[in-house]
Amino acid sequence: LDLHFYSTLFGGYFFVSGLYAGMAGWAFLSAWFLRAEADRLHDLGRLTLAFSILTTYMMFSHILPIWYENLPEEVIFFIPRIHGDWLWITIVLAVMVYLGPLPSLLTIRAKRSRVLLGSITSLILVGLWIERLWLVQPHFEESPRIGLPELSMAAAFWGALYLSRMLAAGRLGAWRNEEEGVIGE
């Protein structure tokens, strides 16, 4: 989101990381809310692992040529993100989104356990949320901060997700008619 930043691979990386977030969200919902059986969780864990590897590959193949070429219009995007106050966020992101899920999702036990898969995917989702802030915020702020607007947007998203789940399950009392059942059936 820098005016002079240019990268041909950024769109592909953003698309693949969005798919990674979708797969992690699907596995998270299946583990915590849908109470899926172990075989389905194992398949979702394998897909999450595959998208983790693909996203890590895309980020590495995005950063390596920029670092090697050292072109000012490309390097200017990464300079504030790897120096100063943003360095620790970069390290946390590398662990939460790229390097952490890889060894933890390699075990069969982690992919078949609701608690482990749900915990791993929740860390991935939080890491990807922080990564979106990491992509945008250094252009506007010199030091990292998560304020009320960022937290309220995240709370609104999770609230809408929970509300849609409650509506889909027919458990929200305001949408229930005693004689006809759930409205819309």
Q: Which residue ranges define each predicted feature?
A:
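Hydrophobic alpha-helical transmembrane segments
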Residues: 87-98, 153-160
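Alpha-helical transmembrane segments
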Residues: 27, 102-104, 161-167
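Juxtamembrane helix-break-helix junctions at the cytosolic face
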Residues: 101-113
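Long, contiguous internal "core" modules enriched in hydrophobic/ aromatic residues
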Residues: 1-93, 103-106, 179-182
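Extracellular/periplasmic helix-loop-helix junctions in multi-pass membrane proteins
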Residues: 3-6, 71, 110-114, 135-149
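Central hydrophobic cores of alpha-helical transmembrane segments
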Residues: 115-126
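Extramembrane terminal tails and long inter-domain/linker segments of multi-pass membrane proteins
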Residues: 154-185
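Hydrophobic, well-ordered secondary-structure elements that form the walls
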Residues: 57, 101, 132, 173
